[in-house]
Amino acid sequence: MGFIYQALVALVVACCACAASADTLFRDPLDTPALHSDKAGTSLLVGVTRTPGGRWVAVGRRGHVLWSDDAHAWHQAKVPVSVDLVAVSFPSPEHGWAVGHGGVILRSLDGGRSWETQLDGRRLADLLIAHWRPLAAQASETEPGARLALQDAERFKDEGPGRPFLDVAFIDEQTGYAVGAYNLILMTTDAGAHWQVLSDRADNPSALHLNAVRLLDRQAYLVGEQGLLLQENPGTGRFEAIQTPYGGTWFGLLARPDLMLLFGLRGTAYASHDQGASWTQVDTGTQGTLNAGASLADGRVVLVTAEGRLLLSDDASAGHFRAVPVDSTQPLYGIATGQNATAVAVGAAGVRLFDLAADAASR
């Protein structure tokens, strides 16, 4: 009996030691700064933008943020988290925001060199609960949407900060939007000091994921699953659904006064030249997933795919695309354009620089 007792005591001590060791080893990525790595420029990057001041900023895995003033020499930024980052927006040369997993919203005040946390999943859960609780109390039996949303927010808090933001777009240094999984829509009008939940204003009763937000004339457009396209109505403050001809997932939207281009799964893309009143299917020449797109200065559009392809439209109407020769098949997830038809794409192998002016000259 004494031997069994001693063995049990030893087992308990060993388990406690293991638990203590595990607690010591685990570091919450929301509280752990991104590690500096010489390989950050060739590791997984998901989003990229070019600031109004001409700087390139890319974001990606484990909190990696890179910046460059010439698209050749890249520098790693100081980032207070090590969660995956997926999107970045700079409305001015110095002020920018990045979003990603764990409900993270980061802000930079120095052109992307360093970042601070404005929101994370722990505070996001409390924000959602505070928003939905009074609406749930007023909800009728026939319209239980707010009650279900409150239950979902409470479950989110219990399970931990795993809900991601998937995109961010700022109009100016004060006003911006962040969107994400399960109809997550936030807006700020004070540079991110406070965030307002707008999810109840969206025509998205199934709480579909929102993959991208784009701005046109200070108006927000959101795209997501099951062909969802939402247009902000400045008069009512609601995000109203626009009918689209495709029932699959949209991963991106290009919004210009002369063109709206939706793109997503299986090489599917549709163009509208009348603000979404009518749509024409686009010949992309691929069955691969279209992950991101951007406009060149001459109006042509460039798209990148999960197959690692770079597609360029023949003209500004974006009715037909052709493949630009690339020397890799690594997936591409983000694209931004600069002067003289230069483009920076990011993906599984990090940063790629393309000279699309040279491609046009060789045709």
Please tell me what each predicted stretch does.
Residues 1-8:
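Bacterial N-terminal signal peptides that target proteins for export
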Residues 14-21:
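N-terminal signal peptide c-region/cleavage motif recognized by signal peptidases
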